[in-house]
């Protein structure tokens, strides 16, 4: 946890923060934020920028950002710990696994935009004066989004919807809030999902998860033409972000009698999902195509 940077070792099992949620391994992010705040930290969750990240680093603050994942991980958090002005690279650190990176600013920003450029800052309370006159975009609504995610994983679906409706009332241009809302409506098989996802991509045309959500929605509705269309749009934005999306598009393509396209997708699925539990079944299916 970034609190270690400030010399504070907070046990993850304190106050039950390490409890598991449905479909989530370990604690969710809002639990860690709440725990840090109980130990005297202040948090800010907002839409950032490359310039803002550099400003925080110059202030001695290591910001956390939400960026695309890879293979079976749809997204993850990374810490920006520095930057190289000559090479125009951002220096990043991911605690698990223990890895560092030096990512070109253009590439970093391109990927970061896919999730709304979310920035999380955790600082000791005696440093909050640094943010006194800051106008942080989506600060309140992003916090609500994180709280809604907790409710969602606790099974309180309608509580999460209520939270997210509040978030979009506060900030109608918050793409994260609209996409999360779309995700819940998608789980409920509600047509409201389409409305929310379309609002998301109108605000942010590069919002990968919204296009993927639309693909999932139409796949369930057996509208395979639209399912393939939206999965393809996701893949165009980032072809390496989430291996299982190729299997979903393969299903749609099979229904559209595009066997060659489905075969290509299943091969990519296995390449990009090294731990696929259905590898044997997929390999058998490939032999039939």
Where are these regions (language model features)?
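Structural signature of tandem alpha-helical TPR/SEL1-like repeats
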Residues: 155-162, 187-199, 221-233, 257-265, ...
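Terminal, low-structured helical/coil segments at or just beyond the last alpha-helical repeat
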Residues: 255, 260-289
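Helix-start (N-cap) detector for alpha-helical repeat units in TPR-like alpha-solenoids
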Residues: 141, 175-176, 208-209, 242-244, ...
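Conserved active-site-adjacent core of cysteine acyl-enzyme catalytic domains
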Residues: 3-5, 9-10, 14-123, 131, ...
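Alpha-helical segment of the N-proximal tetratricopeptide repeat
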Residues: 133-176, 180-187
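Structural marker of alpha-solenoid helical repeat scaffolds
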Residues: 170, 203, 237-238, 272
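Canonical tetratricopeptide repeat
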Residues: 180, 213, 247-248, 282-285
